């Protein structure tokens, strides 16, 4: 009986070990990423610098485990997740990625987890780090000095669904709305975020220095300090949070958040 248990355990461990493949070069990462069949986990074992866009995964289900290694995008675009795909991004340190929408990840499919350290990523449109029109279960990590020309300096939820956003958001900025996070509706599709909880420090935008919402947001909790809404030709809204939709619950510590407009600021420094 013991022998049989050990054999079964050995098979189980072998199968789980075989489910991951390790890569240590950009070429290796892209080759594994594009395969239509293969292991479900790609483990990155060394720091990397990109010479081109990462692009879309070839197979329907994939997890990227960064192993805490740094991936420098060198101003190239990150991952693209298509409809019907399952994708997770774990233990990553990603910087200097840039795209039209979602510098690091543009998600139209389903993502279980996004976590890691994300810094100095950008979008010419919205979503300096993450642009979502699909489903994401959990976003957690450190987001610092990311930028979007339009909205969502770190995270832009465009009619999609996100269960949880957490972490530390420092000095992210957007040219329009949501210095760190923007949750918006599109046509008849309501953007929905169940909860946002984190530390928001020194983020900035014209409306919602830290968070902008015109869709549905369940709860917002955390620490908000030194966030700023500033508009050169219009009225700034909500130094910390600007809400033009539905937020069910807001609680936290608010200090030093400001709203400064070309004329009257709307909603004051903390919440509009």
Question: Where do the PLM segments sit?
Answer:
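All-beta strand scaffolds that present successive hydrophobic residues in beta-strands
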Residues: 62-66, 86-91, 111-118, 136-143, ...
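Glycine-centered low-complexity coil/loop motifs and glycine-rich tracts
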Residues: 70-78, 92-104, 117-129, 141-154, ...
């Amino acid at each position: 009986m013991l022998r049989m248990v050990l054999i079964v355990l050995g098979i189980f461990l072998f199968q789980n070990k075989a489910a991951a493949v390790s890569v240590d070069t950009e070429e290796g990462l892209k080759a594994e990423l594009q395969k239509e069949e293969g292991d479900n986990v790609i483990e990155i074992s060394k720091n990397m610098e990109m010479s081109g866009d990462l692009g879309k995964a070839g197979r329907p289900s994939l997890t990227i485990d960064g192993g805490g290694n740094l991936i420098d995008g060198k101003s190239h675009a990150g991952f693209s997740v298509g409809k019907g795909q399952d994708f997770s991004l774990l233990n990553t340190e990603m910087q200097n990625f840039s795209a039209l929408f979602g510098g690091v990840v543009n998600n139209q499919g389903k993502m279980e987890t996004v976590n890691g350290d994300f810094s100095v990523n950008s979008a010419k449109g919205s979503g300096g780090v993450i642009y979502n029109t699909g489903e994401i279960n959990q976003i957690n990590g450190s987001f610092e000095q990311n930028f979007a020309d339009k909205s969502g300096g770190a995270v832009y939820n465009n009619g999609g669904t996100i269960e949880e956003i957490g972490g530390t958001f420092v000095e992210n900025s957007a040219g329009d709305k949501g210095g760190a996070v923007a949750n918006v509706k599109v046509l008849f599709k309501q953007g929905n975020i169940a909860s946002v909880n984190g530390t928001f420090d020194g983020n900035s935008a014209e409306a919602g220095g830290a968070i902008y919402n015109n869709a549905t947001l369940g709860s917002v909790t955390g620490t908000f300090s030194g966030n700023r809404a500033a508009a050169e030709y219009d009225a700034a809204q909500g130094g910390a949070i600007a809400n033009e939709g539905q937020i069910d619950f807001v609680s936290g510590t608010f200090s030093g958040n400001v709203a400064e407009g070309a004329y009257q600021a709307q909603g004051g420094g903390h919440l509009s």
